[in-house]
């Protein structure tokens, strides 16, 4: 199977809407935040308030990590403007569809901003038929490496 097929399966497993932990860091101060995420156009999208520390951390250090279940993602975040700006129309539509309460409470707040994370690497553990398959996806070089992890019972 080629990288594009693994990439499609990877994004399909994340789902169009999910909750993930976002890890940010700046000047030796790491933090982790549970985020409501949308997955589309090869990226992971979320929103936050410009008043929160994670906004400043991303502004100063766009390297972030995300985690959902047994999937770990490293990527680069960009700040994409207010959720209701024209360029974020798809984001706003999907927020309204999947998270109408969050959309109503937060998307209209002036200080809200959309965050787009482009994955660079991912480690995706899949547990099937007694084998742990570890998919190491390299989105930059468009490569995948699959490891089988067998835990020996001592």
List PLM regions with ranges.
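Charged, low-complexity, helix/coiled-coil-prone segments
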Residues: 1-4, 29-41, 131-136
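Short secondary-structure boundary/capping segments
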Residues: 12, 36, 56, 105-107
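A generic structural signal for nonpolar/aromatic side chains embedded in well-ordered alpha-helices
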Residues: 14, 58, 94-95
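Charged, gly/pro-rich active-site loop segments
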Residues: 72-154
């Amino acid at each position: 199977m080629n990288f594009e097929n693994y990439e499609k399966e990877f994004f399909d497993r994340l789902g169009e809407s999910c909750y993930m932990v976002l890890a940010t860091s700046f000047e030796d101060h790491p933090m982790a935040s549970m985020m409501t995420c949308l997955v589309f156009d090869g990226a992971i999208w979320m929103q936050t308030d410009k008043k929160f520390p994670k906004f400043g951390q991303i502004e100063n250090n766009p390297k972030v990590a995300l985690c959902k279940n047994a999937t770990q993602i490293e990527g680069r975040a960009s700040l994409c403007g207010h959720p209701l700006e024209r360029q974020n129309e798809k984001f706003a539509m999907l927020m309204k569809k999947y998270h109408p309460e969050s959309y109503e409470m937060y998307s209209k707040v002036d200080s809200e901003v959309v965050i787009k994370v482009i994955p660079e690497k991912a480690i995706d553990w899949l547990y099937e038929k007694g084998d742990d398959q570890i998919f190491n996806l390299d989105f930059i070089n468009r490569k995948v490496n699959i490891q089988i992890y067998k835990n020996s019972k001592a």
